[in-house]
Amino acid sequence: MIGEKKKRIGLIFGGYSNEHEVSISSAKTVFQAFNSEINKKRFKVKSFYIDKYGDWLDNDLSEKILNDEIKSNNIKKQEIVNQQKINFLDGIEFQNIDVWFPLLHGLNGEDGSIHGLLQYTRKPIVGCGILGSAIGMDKIMMKTIFSNLKIPQVNYLAFQNEDLDDREVKKKVINEILKKLNFPFFVKPSNSGSSLGISKVINESEILQSLEKAQKIDSRILVEEGLEVREIECGIIGNSELLTSEIGEIKYESDWYDYDSKYYSNNKIIIPAEIDSKITKEIKKIAIQSCRALNIFGFARVDFFLEKSSNKILLNEINTIPGFTTNSMFPMLWKASGLNIEQLVAKLVDISLDL
């Protein structure tokens, strides 16, 4: 509308996380979408880059990263001093924000910590709240809730660091895994994303190394049985009413859908997925049911397995801040559903304002 004041968007990216670089890539896509011809009439973006040490940097340096004028790993300490780090608690840099758009993937962001901090500003936040974010980040807690709801999943076991304290205890854990799960299986940190820290285990000799690898990232470890499956994904947006996107399938060239496959491989994306209409309907139903159960709203991506031998639907996990990179499934799903990236980011802001 003529004369309507532009909404000031606080775009937060980077972060003290193993998924730092993915966050930057996502933020670049969203930044460009907000600065498109159609959106720059409605929105003005102020960027906040959080470096790998957790320091907040001001808009000028943040925009240079988003515009590829400088690489995040080339920022010198002197530049940070000259630009002056931002103290969030001072509030000076944050007073003129109307809506927050956090794009921090992984720990110290997607786990609800950034949402809790931003609530102190009393401004709307794109995405879900603290509870849904925290549960969505913790695979073990998430799967426990899904189990209580009787939603089908792959067989799994969960362990704590104290379960792996010494050699004898580790032997008991390995024996339990061998007794209850069939090869292959996947060992995962409970709190991690983008397949970081995950190992595919095909024989007994690999178990201990995979457990120790996961321990380096998190103190809680998930072990899931591997099946012959198709990777199916569904996008969710909304608040009181959750909308589902088209269903998509990812076909990858590697042995499994690891970090490199997600971000550096030429995967085949099929949207809509070539599956039966009844299965599509059931996947969408479970996607909404699972988000409601975890108090997830705003936007999310719900990941499923479809067992090849039986077409059985298995819920995998929910990502509360899915990737927005050029290779990311979430924006592709919504583009196929009638919302291009420019429309999508605007829609997500509108959803946050409706809360």
UniProtKB/Swiss-Prot annotation:
Its cofactor is Mg(2+); Mn(2+). ATP binds at residues 178-233. Binds 2 magnesium or manganese ions per subunit. It comes from the Bacteria. GO terms for cellular component: cytosol. Pathway: Cell wall biogenesis; peptidoglycan biosynthesis. It is found in: Cytoplasm. Keywords: ATP-binding, Cell shape, Cell wall biogenesis/degradation, Cytoplasm, Ligase, Magnesium, Manganese, Metal-binding, Nucleotide-binding, Peptidoglycan synthesis. The keyword Coiled coil does not apply. Mg(2+) 1 binds at D303, E317. Signal peptide: none annotated. GO terms for biological process: cell wall organization; peptidoglycan biosynthetic process; regulation of cell shape. Residues 143-350 form the ATP-grasp domain. InterPro entries: ATP-grasp (IPR011761), ATP_grasp_subdomain_1 (IPR013815), D-Ala_lig_Van_CS (IPR000291), D_ala_D_ala (IPR005905), Dala_Dala_lig_C (IPR011095), Dala_Dala_lig_N (IPR011127), PreATP-grasp_dom_sf (IPR016185). It catalyses: 2 D-alanine + ATP = D-alanyl-D-alanine + ADP + phosphate + H(+). One of its GO terms (molecular function) is ATP binding. Mg(2+) 2 binds at E317, N319. Its EC number is 6.3.2.4. Pfam families: Dala_Dala_lig_C, Dala_Dala_lig_N. Its main location: cytoplasm. Belongs to the D-alanine--D-alanine ligase family. Cell wall formation. This is D-alanine--D-alanine ligase. It comes from Prochlorococcus marinus (strain MIT 9215).
